From Swiss-Prot:
Transferase among keywords: yes
Key words, A-Z: Biotin biosynthesis, Pyridoxal phosphate, Transferase
Highest rank taxon of the organism: Bacteria
A Pfam family of this chain: Aminotran_1_2
Name listed for the protein in its UniProt record: 8-amino-7-oxononanoate synthase
InterPro entries: Aminotrans_II_pyridoxalP_BS, Aminotransferase_I/II_large, AON_synthase_class-II, AONS_Archaea/Proteobacteria, AONS_Proteobacteria, PyrdxlP-dep_Trfase, PyrdxlP-dep_Trfase_major, PyrdxlP-dep_Trfase_small
Residues annotated as binding substrate: 21, 133, 352
Keyword Cytoplasm (UniProt): no
E.C. number: 2.3.1.47
One example of a Gene Ontology biological process annotation: biotin biosynthetic process
Coiled coil start-end: none
Underlying gene: bioF
Catalytic activity: 6-carboxyhexanoyl-[ACP] + L-alanine + H(+) = (8S)-8-amino-7-oxononanoate + holo-[ACP] + CO2
């Protein structure tokens, strides 16, 4: 088989399974509204959970940062790309979340991969929740360590895997809020079992940070858990992009030496770091509290209005509200019907989710209004 035949076969297989992904160029893709092809839709596909992507204070901070520092960092943080803006953001994040250090990364994917590839050796073992993000599972699969997966949120299964002999160290990997189901990990129980077996815990709280807990400190703070490594991202609750790893001083020093994604990548622009500092100020303050409270009210209203629909609603109290449809073609058809009626919704299909669990991944944000939720419910009931 030639290269072209190999590529064509892979694409044909995706088409046959109604699993071929495509992108839509949008004029606006975050916030309450999505604009595409000169049409405006209520946006139920954005991760901008607090509606901060268009916040004037954050936009102003980015502009001022660009005027002060320029539009790029100019290099890796190990060379010339670590600015006083980066340093200030790291210090503020560490203080906010109760850690000694924070290290910035260009994306959550990079942060997750950096942690696992830097920490793990051949004699070690990674024990990951089966539904962990692709960045975590891919890094674990490619690392020299043994990878074992435990049944989703099943602490007893995790304990059995940790109890089997391992010549090296054990790293338990999970998420705070799961990206495709919207449910939460029992972090206190997971940490207890991990500590009983002398392991370390990594929590990716991409979808919890900024959105839940006191001052938006996320899943771990809410459950009174402090993992050895906490990954937070800035493309969701913060409304910007990028990520950080929170850890001890010694682990931070170690990652600065061995995390290749950090060493060999150009740092985020200092202006972006300034915007993130402004976003953090909103998240921690009274306005952040108000946005989280509004989002919680909208989530409750949405779930209460779904009674009678012939879909499986995931057990989620987060901004992620998946409607499990099952069949790929049906999920695509339903997403298109909703778009025709003014609601932009994305169909998520295998391999992103397990076979037979194609879904509409609905996301609610603090930018939405009550009437937006009511319209979405009306459209869903009309197409159920």
């Amino acid at each position: 088989m030639s290269w072209q035949e190999k590529i064509n076969a892979a694409l044909d297989a995706r088409r046959t399974a109604d699993a071929l992904r495509r992108r839509y160029p949008v004029a606006q893709g975050a916030g309450r509204w999505l604009v595409a092809d000169e049409c405006q839709y209520l946006n139920f596909s954005s991760n901008d959970y607090l509606g901060l992507s268009h916040h004037p204070d954050i936009i102003r901070a980015w502009k001022q940062g660009a005027e002060q520092f320029g539009v790029g960092s100019g290099g890796s943080g190990h060379v010339s790309g670590y600015s006083v803006a980066h340093q200030a953001l790291e210090e503020e994040l560490a203080e906010w979340l109760g850690y000694s250090r924070a290290l910035l990364f260009i994306s959550g994917f990079a942060a997750n991969q950096a942690v696992i590839t830097a920490m793990m050796a051949k004699e070690d073992r990674i024990v990951a929740d089966r539904l962990s993000h692709a960045s975590l599972l891919e890094a674990a699969s490619l690392s020299p360590a043994q990878l074992r997966r435990f049944t989703h949120n099943d602490v007893a299964h995790l304990a059995r895997l940790l109890a089997s002999p391992c010549p090296g160290q054990q790293l338990v990997v999970t998420e705070g809020v799961f990206s495709m189901d919207g449910d939460r990990a029992p972090l206190a129980e997971i940490q207890q079992v991990t500590q009983q077996h002398n392991g370390w815990l990594v929590v990716d709280d991409a979808h919890g940070t900024g959105v839940i807990g006191e001052q938006g400190r996320g899943s771990c703070w809410q459950q009174q858990v402090k993992p050895e490594l906490l990954v937070v991202t800035f493309g969701k609750g913060f409304g910007v992009s990028g990520a950080a790893v929170l850890c001890s001083n010694t682990v931070a020093d170690y990652l600065l030496q061995f995390a290749r994604h950090l060493i060999y990548s150009t740092s985020m622009p200092p202006a972006q770091a300034q915007a993130l500092r402004a976003s953090l100020a909103v998240i921690r303050g009274e306005e952040g509290d108000a946005r989280r409270e509004k989002l919680a009210v909208l989530i409750t209203r949405f779930r209460a209005g779904l009674q009678g629909l012939p879909f499986t609603l995931a057990d989620s109290r987060s901004a992620i509200q998946p409607l499990i449809v099952g069949d790929n073609a049906r999920a695509l058809h339903l997403a298109e019907k909703l778009r025709q009626q003014g609601c932009w919704v994305t169909a998520i299909r295998p391999p992103t989710v397990p076979a037979g669990t194609a879904r509409l991944r609905l996301t609610l944000t603090a930018a939405h209004e009550t009437q937006d939720i009511d319209l979405l419910l009306e459209v869903l009931h009309g197409n159920g």
